[in-house]
């Protein structure tokens, strides 16, 4: 457990998204169009929450009126938000509305029906197959969310992904005008380290393997446990696995993970749950390696946090992970536990190699911090403002009810095609019933005794 210091304060400052004091653009006059944001939930300490607040700081510094409208918010952030229904009162065809898309929220549906020029920001939706047999409701919500995304294809003046990977999904979904609004995370929440935490008890000379993220199926925590088991039994018995992140809502998956630990009889696996920012910083400080086996990420901020805290990263090369790491750290392409354990041993037993990895991560982090988030955002806002005034889409009172019925029909088509093949092709249900009644009568006539027919 070698304690590491984070990057210099000056570097950290340049990486804060939406730095206050961004230059105000000239030549717009006293009245500037409002640029509001709408999303389902503003969470405390999560990547989307940081991005939303950063966007607001940039917009306000540039002279725009900018509010955050939500359905729900963490109690610690409620004072920074307004109820999504208030958006109706401030809506205008000349305004820009930045819509952070999420699955099936009422806030999203209100935003859809307003005349504001919409800029959709897509943070990705996990493919539903990851949650089969673990969270049936989430399977349905993710399936519907990915389908609902298509309803906004012609509603937006721009559709932005917060990574190149997410933008590629927008292009594949048929959005005609797309771009990348890069995530430039703030690391200010890691500036202070708690004293007297459980993390300090792990700073004892053992090798600490760390993962930070929710305990959910697409993060493949089960693969992390299998890899750690191979490393501990074959390479280093004085090692422990620290799993930091909430498992709320995924009790069944969490129980499966605990059962896996018991089945493998692997000791020193610690499920640490959700922790404070100060405790999180302490866990990064005692970590010797950040290990990631996730198979679906839209960006993955904890990878950048590990870079910032100078913890060498070994991650599975899937979805947005390679582009997020941008040449820093080490990627692996096979999930063989013995293979990954050997790579872990090669890294941790070679101090010079660790320094080379940390240098590659520092360079990647510098490239990330050098991205002009403020300028990129304001250019996209100007592009949206230059679009013709918005027109409220013609939405019937039962539009979303009909959309949900179509979703259900599409789900049947994909997963129970035989049910659709059983429906009449050219006739209505009434015609089909009439035809069936006639056929029944004919069969009865043919099957009756000769005397009755005569």
Predicted regions located by residue number:
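Aromatic "clamp/platform" in nucleotide-sugar-dependent glycosyltransferases that forms part
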Residues: 295
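Short alpha-helical donor nucleotide-sugar binding micro-motif in glycosyltransferases
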Residues: 275, 282-287
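Conserved donor-binding/catalytic core segment of Leloir-type glycosyltransferases
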Residues: 160, 199-219, 224-228, 242
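Glycosyltransferase donor-sugar binding loop
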Residues: 71-74, 238-255
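Conserved acidic donor-binding segment of nucleotide-sugar-dependent glycosyltransferases
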Residues: 330-337, 346-351
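Short hydrophobic beta-strand element within catalytic cores of glycosyltransferases
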Residues: 312-315
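Donor nucleotide-sugar binding/catalytic pocket of nucleotide-sugar-dependent glycosyltransferases
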Residues: 153-196
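Nucleotide-activated donor-binding/catalytic signature segment of Leloir-type glycosyltransferases, i.e.
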Residues: 254-278
């Amino acid at each position: 457990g070698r304690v590491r210091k984070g990057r210099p304060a000056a570097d950290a400052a340049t990486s804060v998204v939406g730095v206050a004091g961004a230059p105000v653009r000239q030549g717009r006059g006293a009245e500037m169009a409002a640029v509001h944001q709408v999303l389902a939930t503003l969470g405390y300490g999560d990547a989307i929450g940081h991005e939303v607040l950063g966007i607001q700081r940039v917009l306000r510094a540039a002279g725009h009126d900018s509010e955050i409208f939500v359905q729900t918010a963490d109690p610690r952030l409620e004072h920074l938000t307004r109820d999504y229904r208030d958006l109706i009162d401030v809506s205008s065809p000349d305004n820009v509305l930045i819509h952070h898309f999420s699955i099936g929220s009422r806030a999203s549906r209100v935003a859809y029906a307003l005349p504001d020029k919409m800029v959709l920001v897509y943070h990705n939706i996990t493919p539903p197959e990851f949650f089969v047999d673990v969270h049936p409701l989430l399977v349905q919500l993710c399936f519907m969310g990915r389908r609902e995304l298509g309803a906004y294809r012609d509603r937006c003046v721009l559709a932005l992904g917060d990574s190149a990977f997410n933008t590629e999904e927008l292009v594949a979904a048929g959005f005609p005008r797309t771009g990348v609004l890069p995530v430039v995370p703030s690391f200010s929440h890691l500036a202070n380290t708690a004293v007297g935490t459980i993390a300090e008890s792990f700073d004892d000379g053992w090798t600490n393997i760390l993962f930070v993220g929710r305990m959910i199926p697409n993060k493949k925590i089960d693969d992390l446990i299998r890899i750690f088991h191979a490393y501990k039994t074959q390479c280093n018995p004085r090692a422990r696995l620290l799993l930091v992140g909430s498992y709320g809502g995924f009790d069944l998956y969490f129980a499966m993970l605990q059962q896996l630990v018991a089945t493998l009889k692997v000791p020193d696996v610690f499920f640490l749950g959700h922790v404070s920012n100060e405790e999180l910083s302490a866990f990064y400080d005692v970590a010797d390696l950040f290990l990631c086996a996730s198979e679906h990420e839209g960006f993955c901020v904890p990878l950048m946090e590990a870079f910032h805290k100078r913890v060498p990263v070994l991650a599975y090369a899937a979805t947005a992970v390679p582009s997020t790491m941008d040449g820093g750290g080490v990627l692996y392409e096979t999930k063989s536990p013995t293979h990954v354990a050997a790579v872990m041993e090669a890294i941790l037993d070679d101090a010079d190699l660790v320094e080379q990895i940390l240098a590659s991560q520092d360079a990647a982090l510098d490239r990330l911090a050098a991205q002009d988030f403020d300028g990129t955002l304001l250019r996209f806002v100007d592009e949206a403002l230059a679009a013709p005034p918005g027109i409220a889409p013609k939405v019937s009172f039962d539009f979303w009810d009909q959309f949900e019925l179509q979703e259900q029909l599409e789900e049947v088509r994909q997963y129970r095609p035989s049910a659709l093949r059983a429906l009449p092709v050219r006739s209505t249900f009434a015609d089909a019933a009439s035809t069936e009644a006639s056929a029944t009568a004919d069969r009865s006539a043919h099957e009756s005794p000769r005397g009755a027919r005569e």
